[in-house]
Amino acid sequence: MADPTRARKLADRIKVIVADALEKRVKDPRLGFVTITDARVTNDLQHATLFYTVFGSDEEKQGTALALESAKGVLRSEVGKRTGIRLTPTLTFTLDEVPETATQIQDLLKQAAEQDARVAALAAAAQPAGDPDPYKKPVDHTDDWDEDDEDDRDGDDAVDALDAAADVPRL
């Protein structure tokens, strides 16, 4: 087991070496516009996985994958020469899905922003349901009392007691 820091440094070095070798040494016509995006090395330094992206159509991506597989031996020998380590790791090439995923996430965020704008436009024109002032206020009974209400008192003691409890003024 190697130190994780050493494995990370070796992965970075392999990434640079392979990118340089693809640019200068590999002359396969199937090789499209390739970018090595990341490299990872196992802790025992025996296997290296290189992630790459290809600018182009699906056919160009397949052609590039075949070209990388056929150039794997040349690239591995170049890594062995330029790193100077005892055992050269095997190389595995994996198409990087991050750019496509990032594009999908960006599209989803754009849709969410459009929906937020529509909701904000609806909210700006919305009016609250019910009364403009929904809070209860104390009832003022003094305005309700007039001379016509004098005949309401018919001697019913229960009603008179309720009126007295409610602080209804008597004239």
Curated annotation (Swiss-Prot):
Where in or outside the cell it occurs: the entry states: Cytoplasm
Annotated region (Disordered) at 120-171
**Ranges of compositional bias, category Low complexity:** 120-132, 161-171
Which residue intervals are annotated with compositional bias (Basic and acidic residues) in the record? 133-142
* Classification via Pfam families: RBFA
One Gene Ontology cellular component term attached to this UniProt record is: cytosol
Its keywords, alphabetically, are:
Cytoplasm, Ribosome biogenesis
Any GO molecular function: ribosomal small subunit binding
Which stretch is the leader sequence? Answer: none
The residue ranges flagged as biased composition, category Acidic residues, are 143-160
Annotated PROSITE patterns: RBFA
Q: Which family does it belong to?
A: Belongs to the RbfA family.
Q: Oligomeric state and partners?
A: Monomer. Binds 30S ribosomal subunits, but not 50S ribosomal subunits or 70S ribosomes.
| NCBIfam families for this protein | rbfA
Reported function: One of several proteins that assist in the late maturation steps of the functional core of the 30S ribosomal subunit. Associates with free 30S ribosomal subunits (but not with 30S subunits that are part of 70S ribosomes or polysomes). Required for efficient processing of 16S rRNA. May interact with the 5'-terminal helix region of 16S rRNA.
Q: What is this protein called?
A: Ribosome-binding factor A
User: From which source organism is this entry?
Assistant: Kineococcus radiotolerans (strain ATCC BAA-149 / DSM 14245 / SRS30216)
